[in-house]
């Protein structure tokens, strides 16, 4: 993923990088304080299907959906919930004790596991909450994991 950001930076002459875990969550929350930045009918998990690609075809997709298939969030960002987990720049940590307070990525010399945020099309909708986090091996590949880059202005 970092190689892609470096390639894109070289190709365009603009600086691209992977998001930190904190940046990814900030973008997913889009100014909201609750677990979801969109209406969620408790007990009716599939109300999320109007806002994100999650488990089952109630959202119109059996697997991944095309980018922009659901409305953007309050920040104007698309697809922050569901579809695929997003690999972020941070190494996996199972807690926040010692995490950078400036929003930068929490790195180690060598990441045995990487941090992934969001959720994928094969998981129950409850995992679409803005704070959902998980881990993956750096070698993991599949139709359930992707990444997002940021362009520095």
Language-model features: where?
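Functional-site microenvironments in short loops/helix caps that host divalent-cation chemistry
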Residues: 1-134, 138-143
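Short, structured beta-strand segments at or near domain termini in extracellular proteins/domains
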Residues: 143-153
């Amino acid at each position: 993923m970092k190689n892609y950001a470096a390639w894109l930076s070289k190709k365009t002459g603009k600086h691209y990088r992977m998001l930190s875990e904190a940046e990814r969550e900030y973008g997913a929350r889009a100014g909201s304080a609750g677990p979801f930045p969109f209406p969620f009918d408790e007990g009716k998990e599939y109300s999320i299907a109007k806002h994100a690609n999650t488990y089952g075809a109630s959202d119109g997709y059996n697997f991944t959906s095309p980018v922009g298939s659901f409305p953007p969030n309050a920040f104007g960002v698309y697809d922050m919930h569901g579809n695929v987990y997003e690999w972020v720049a941070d190494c996996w940590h199972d807690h926040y004790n010692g995490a950078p307070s400036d929003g930068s990525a929490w790195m180690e010399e060598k990441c045995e596991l990487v941090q992934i945020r969001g959720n994928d099309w094969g998981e129950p909708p409850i995992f679409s909450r803005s704070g959902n986090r998980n881990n993956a091996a750096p070698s993991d590949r599949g139709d359930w994991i992707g990444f997002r880059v940021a362009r520095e202005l």
